[in-house]
């Protein structure tokens, strides 16, 4: 694509002015100014569709979609989720300026993290050169009895006259749908008064890990080979992953690829003992955490998650760091539904992350690539 292809195009910027005690508004303004400067050089226009809140910004980005050709989301994983829900399945590219405390989706794509000028330069280069990748998303929708909550607080929604509201969940996510321990850690961190995001998350993790609950889930999943599996999972942790990272860099789902048409279900088989915790932590950032036998794993095309008869009540579900709703829910992979602006080097790197490399990692960890079970699969094949 030539440089003239972006002449008269419009780039919209969306941020969350309420984030980081108002600093999000300052960063959003900086991004607008940097893009305007680049637009004068390359011939594109810039508009700001940021609202007064997260939900207001999402509504603006959706309702004004016919006014722009590219959307640039400024903030953390929650703002990436906002962008995904604004332009997902539309073919309009999303640019990412990652300035949050987690930035796990951007990290998985090897995009700049907390480097505003570098991120904007990459977005401008991608617009001018026409470089992008198409990535999968998850679509979470309510089953009967499930409902959405306030995306900012996790509270049940009520009308102006305090009548409880039960709207259905209908939400794209780009990174993780957190259904257990990871959601409860995020929730505690969100309500913490500690000043630093990483410190809030670390302290919340310590508290929740030392008071671990066994949540009760019943799952019905279509696996990668098309077979259907139905079972109870009584576990502290259950995550439906599209990307690899969570919690600011922990590779909880190291086999995930952004464009394989699959989601990865990761859970704890049981509450880990001290030795198992040490083993998991030692592999948390190396891509080898699923070599720890305390974890269960399966690749799925879709999954229904309902409440099991036993186990503790699961917490409010969270996706990409934002509150989603209550079980029951169905999650379906949306194959290559989100177009993301990336520099050419990132596009090449993502293309190099092939299925063969993932299968090598699965084999290294002694797992069956279809059932996810450990040891027995490769023991049989070696006979």
Residue ranges of each PLM-predicted region?
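ATP/NTP phosphate-donor binding region
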Residues: 1-74, 81, 85, 121, ...
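ATP/nucleoside-binding phosphotransfer catalytic cores, i.e., glycine-rich phosphate-binding loops
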Residues: 3-6, 24, 221-232, 251-383
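Catalytic core of DAGKc-family lipid kinases
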Residues: 12, 36-38, 45, 49-51, ...
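A residue-level signal for conserved active-site and pocket-lining positions in enzyme catalytic cores
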Residues: 16, 77, 185, 238, ...
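Glycine-rich beta-strand-to-loop/alpha-helix junction loops that act as flexible
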Residues: 17, 74-76, 97-101
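Short, glycine/serine-rich, charged loops/turns that create anion-binding
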Residues: 18-19, 101, 181, 244-245, ...
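Short amphipathic alpha-helical segments
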Residues: 25-27, 83-87, 107-109, 251-252
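Glycine-rich phosphate/pyrophosphate-binding beta-alpha loops
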Residues: 178, 182, 237-255, 322-323
